[in-house]
């Protein structure tokens, strides 16, 4: 037993590395300490062992989560340090920390850094990191939905079939293309670069982009002016390259893409293209030194240039043969001229561009412009003729004559000589016009014309029933006169229904609102229908017309429903009925207009008038509700006439059949104009336009306010009595009333 106790005591002493007064040296990672009056070697903090023979480092990092969340532990001799993982930082801003110093790891918001994701991208912070997403209209270069800057991804523009509708997309593509070809300063190389790009498969946005570059880029046209190469062949090559480039933009296989554009946008870009083609051709040709002729012929574009000096001017007759026809320029004769002058005459022929410039969207209330008939089509090539002379008065145009073959037979149709009329400062309003041109001969296959100015020419075909210029002018005067008279009559009606207390009733309330709606519609029409120079203002006017005309229709419908309720003798609550009448009369048109605008706001306002475009059948957002209301009114009309006929026959059995029919006819006529069934002529004019439907529709609707005044006020016995009371105290008026 004593031996066992001795062994235990020795073991304890050894474990404490007992030596008298630590006579045995302690290890470097140990220190001598007195415990219970006994000196011994003990390992320092962070180490374990007997202090004499061994002191091993303690790996604190083996302990789970010793550093807390979002941190990693790093063991050191006699201790450890904590570091925040990527995407986190210490709360105290230190690089490293220990758990007992009050620090912890918190998320770093990388999105606070400007442009951390690069161009056209947005940053989204996440716990311990962030993700990048491309903005609308862009996608990652690697096809990923999200990315980080260090994975090699970046945002690039999405070029798709709908991109042409977005201005930002076009602008971005133009800038990108200019950056790529901008460093090229040599003219032929630049034209060749654009031509080479146009030879590849093109999207609509590519075509529009290159047209904008040709139109707006000063690098091309400016360098043309500064080029001094003496080689005419050099510039001939430039003209060839340029002609092929334009051809690639207008050849037939691009028409399907062009058709994707709204009519006004398509016309705008084609106008820019034709203007740029004419301008650049003249600019290049100015550098040709010799008297020469240049021809270029491609699939859908032909080009011919005459360059001559004043010495050869009398013997040069600029002309161009055009696919079975020709075009010829005749200058004014002069007795004296500058012997050092020079002249350039350029012709371009676009063989297939005509259908893209045909008219399609100019219908409103039966009125059509003399410059753009409702169903006109281009049935020939489009030719361009331009002159540049130095000095400018050296070679002035007297006339241009041309004969063009028809691409379609013109049987039972009339042809017209026309030119593409546009302003260089505003190319949005390009349209066909016949001003300054006259037809000299026409048959089923060819038409000959003579014009007094230069631009782009073509032959138009329109149905023989189309409205002629004289008819259009007459219709315009009828519309203006009728609306002015109607406004006066409607103003009298509004005054009558508003201020004559003796006639106040539900029916006069309906009449008052109907007259107000129609008054505002016709006032906006008279003032703003032709304010088409500002697209935004024109769209607002079209929207107001859409709303007020629909409101007038709604109150017309209410009139029919109310008369039906009276005739059939249904019992109704007056207050409830009035409330619902106002809701239907003013809210339902607003719903229709709002819904239509949300689906196709760009169809409010055309290049001709501030009305709804017929493109994509958008005009039916007005005609549809109008037809529905007309149908409801016609049904109510039938019931009312039937009831009135029976009622009249029952009350006056002694009245002859003629008088009975006349009584019914008077009421029928009143309802016919009052309830707007004359708008049926408008629908007929849309479906089958003719001079007859145009006159019927224009007269019946322009004077609708006058008809309302006649039937609601003049022929009303009660209102006659009110007018008598009003004017009987006025001597001059009383004598007239006697």
Curated annotation (Swiss-Prot):
<feature type="disulfide bond">
    <location>
        <begin position="111"/>
        <end position="123"/>
    </location>
</feature>
<dbReference type="InterPro" id="IPR001881">
    <property type="entry name" value="EGF-like_Ca-bd_dom"/>
</dbReference>
<keyword id="KW-1133">Transmembrane helix</keyword>
<feature type="signal peptide">
    <location>
        <begin position="1"/>
        <end position="19"/>
    </location>
</feature>
<feature type="domain" description="EGF-like 1">
    <location>
        <begin position="20"/>
        <end position="56"/>
    </location>
</feature>
<feature type="disulfide bond">
    <location>
        <begin position="117"/>
        <end position="132"/>
    </location>
</feature>
<keyword id="KW-0245">EGF-like domain</keyword>
<dbReference type="GO" id="GO:0005509">
    <property type="term" value="F:calcium ion binding"/>
</dbReference>
<feature type="transmembrane region" description="Helical; Name=5">
    <location>
        <begin position="622"/>
        <end position="642"/>
    </location>
</feature>
<dbReference type="GO" id="GO:0007189">
    <property type="term" value="P:adenylate cyclase-activating G protein-coupled receptor signaling pathway"/>
</dbReference>
<dbReference type="InterPro" id="IPR000742">
    <property type="entry name" value="EGF-like_dom"/>
</dbReference>
<dbReference type="InterPro" id="IPR000203">
    <property type="entry name" value="GPS"/>
</dbReference>
<dbReference type="Pfam" id="PF16489">
    <property type="entry name" value="GAIN"/>
</dbReference>
<feature type="glycosylation site" description="N-linked (GlcNAc...) asparagine">
    <location>
        <position position="421"/>
    </location>
</feature>
<dbReference type="Pfam" id="PF00002">
    <property type="entry name" value="7tm_2"/>
</dbReference>
<feature type="topological domain" description="Cytoplasmic">
    <location>
        <begin position="643"/>
        <end position="666"/>
    </location>
</feature>
<keyword id="KW-1015">Disulfide bond</keyword>
<dbReference type="InterPro" id="IPR000832">
    <property type="entry name" value="GPCR_2_secretin-like"/>
</dbReference>
<feature type="glycosylation site" description="N-linked (GlcNAc...) asparagine">
    <location>
        <position position="175"/>
    </location>
</feature>
<feature type="region of interest" description="GPS">
    <location>
        <begin position="417"/>
        <end position="467"/>
    </location>
</feature>
<feature type="disulfide bond">
    <location>
        <begin position="67"/>
        <end position="82"/>
    </location>
</feature>
<feature type="domain" description="EGF-like 2; calcium-binding">
    <location>
        <begin position="57"/>
        <end position="106"/>
    </location>
</feature>
<keyword id="KW-0675">Receptor</keyword>
<feature type="transmembrane region" description="Helical; Name=3">
    <location>
        <begin position="548"/>
        <end position="568"/>
    </location>
</feature>
<feature type="domain" description="GAIN-B">
    <location>
        <begin position="292"/>
        <end position="467"/>
    </location>
</feature>
<feature type="disulfide bond">
    <location>
        <begin position="22"/>
        <end position="32"/>
    </location>
</feature>
<feature type="disulfide bond">
    <location>
        <begin position="43"/>
        <end position="55"/>
    </location>
</feature>
<feature type="glycosylation site" description="N-linked (GlcNAc...) asparagine">
    <location>
        <position position="429"/>
    </location>
</feature>
<feature type="site" description="Cleavage; by autolysis">
    <location>
        <begin position="454"/>
        <end position="455"/>
    </location>
</feature>
<dbReference type="InterPro" id="IPR049883">
    <property type="entry name" value="NOTCH1_EGF-like"/>
</dbReference>
<feature type="transmembrane region" description="Helical; Name=7">
    <location>
        <begin position="695"/>
        <end position="715"/>
    </location>
</feature>
<feature type="disulfide bond">
    <location>
        <begin position="26"/>
        <end position="41"/>
    </location>
</feature>
<dbReference type="InterPro" id="IPR018097">
    <property type="entry name" value="EGF_Ca-bd_CS"/>
</dbReference>
<keyword id="KW-0106">Calcium</keyword>
<feature type="glycosylation site" description="N-linked (GlcNAc...) asparagine">
    <location>
        <position position="443"/>
    </location>
</feature>
<dbReference type="Pfam" id="PF01825">
    <property type="entry name" value="GPS"/>
</dbReference>
<feature type="transmembrane region" description="Helical; Name=2">
    <location>
        <begin position="523"/>
        <end position="543"/>
    </location>
</feature>
<feature type="transmembrane region" description="Helical; Name=1">
    <location>
        <begin position="481"/>
        <end position="501"/>
    </location>
</feature>
<dbReference type="GO" id="GO:0065003">
    <property type="term" value="P:protein-containing complex assembly"/>
</dbReference>
<feature type="disulfide bond">
    <location>
        <begin position="61"/>
        <end position="73"/>
    </location>
</feature>
<comment type="similarity">
    <text>Belongs to the G-protein coupled receptor 2 family. Adhesion G-protein coupled receptor (ADGR) subfamily.</text>
</comment>
<dbReference type="GO" id="GO:0031410">
    <property type="term" value="C:cytoplasmic vesicle"/>
</dbReference>
